[in-house]
Amino acid sequence: MEIIFYHPTFNAAWWVNALEKALPHVRVREWKAGDNSPADYALVWQPPVEMLAGRRLKAVFALGAGVDSILSELNTHPEMLDASIPLFRLEDTGMGLQMQEYAVSQVLHWFRRFDDYQALKNQAIWKPLPEYTREEFSVGIMGAGILGSKVAESLQAWGFPLRCWSRSRKSWPGVESYAGREELDAFLNQTRVLINLLPNTAQTVGIINRELLNKLPDSAYVLNLARGVHVNEADLLAALESGKLKGAMLDVFSQEPLPQESPLWRHSRVAMTPHIAAVTRPAEAIEYISRTINQLERGEPVTGQVDRARGY
């Protein structure tokens, strides 16, 4: 059995060695331009069209939780990957815990008013502020997949009122579920902290815009952990200037790296990180990939396959 591997930044030699240890009966090679030799599986991130086009693969594994870069490429180069070839994404592989850490730490940061105290410190002002109550600090999660469920689970332990919004209704204990566009307004109007974990699809691009932000309570917060294209950055800045939003924490941006001229860099109520909220953990990823390949070879049911029509 042959596996081809491609990632523009990962240490390919390390991955090849680790995969061959996990799958001793398999030969793994780093794909390079001009390599047209047969392969059974491909492990990729932002692969060139020529890597996959025309191959009779058993499956392709994206080396991340999102597959939007591959699906976007397929829109313009449908020959890149035959529709009959299953496409898999990394389901969790350590990303759930990372998202939990990020979301909980940021919600608590806002809840305890550390941003306000930092602003006072910058002015050399000693001033205790009124506390927020949990009842007025409802957290709403857009996107109810594996990562969304993990974040909800971790926040529940801290006693915050929780709600989620997704394409279909969920039955999560202790979480109010809203589904579909017809219930979006009801979801938003009591959401003090909006956490975005939506997949990147044609339906979700630009969803966090002026219209949506205006439906949040005044002095709300936005935490974007999904994709930069979900947020209209000009509308977000306008909402911060008007006071509709009290703060924003952004891990992803419409253009990455974020251009130096972006006003987001200089806004006092915008905090940011460089797309590191949940990174691929190699050991966990290899365990999932090797297990799934073995299941596929035995004809057993598997999880993590992407529905190309839905985009996730």
Swiss-Prot record:
It catalyses: glycolate + NADP(+) = glyoxylate + NADPH + H(+); (R)-glycerate + NAD(+) = 3-hydroxypyruvate + NADH + H(+); (R)-glycerate + NADP(+) = 3-hydroxypyruvate + NADPH + H(+). Signal peptide: none annotated. GO terms for cellular component: cytoplasm. It is found in: Cytoplasm. Keywords: Cytoplasm, NAD, NADP, Oxidoreductase. CDD domains: GDH_like_2. InterPro entries: D-isomer_DH_CS (IPR029753), D-isomer_DH_NAD-bd (IPR006140), GhrA_Enterobacterales (IPR023514), NAD(P)-bd_dom_sf (IPR036291). HAMAP family: 2_Hacid_dh_C_GhrA (MF_01666). Catalyzes the NADPH-dependent reduction of glyoxylate and hydroxypyruvate into glycolate and glycerate, respectively. Belongs to the D-isomer specific 2-hydroxyacid dehydrogenase family. GhrA subfamily. PANTHER family: 2-HACID_DH_C DOMAIN-CONTAINING PROTEIN, D-ISOMER SPECIFIC 2-HYDROXYACID DEHYDROGENASE NAD-BINDING DOMAIN-CONTAINING PROTEIN. This is Glyoxylate/hydroxypyruvate reductase A. It comes from Salmonella arizonae (strain ATCC BAA-731 / CDC346-86 / RSK2980). The gene is ghrA.
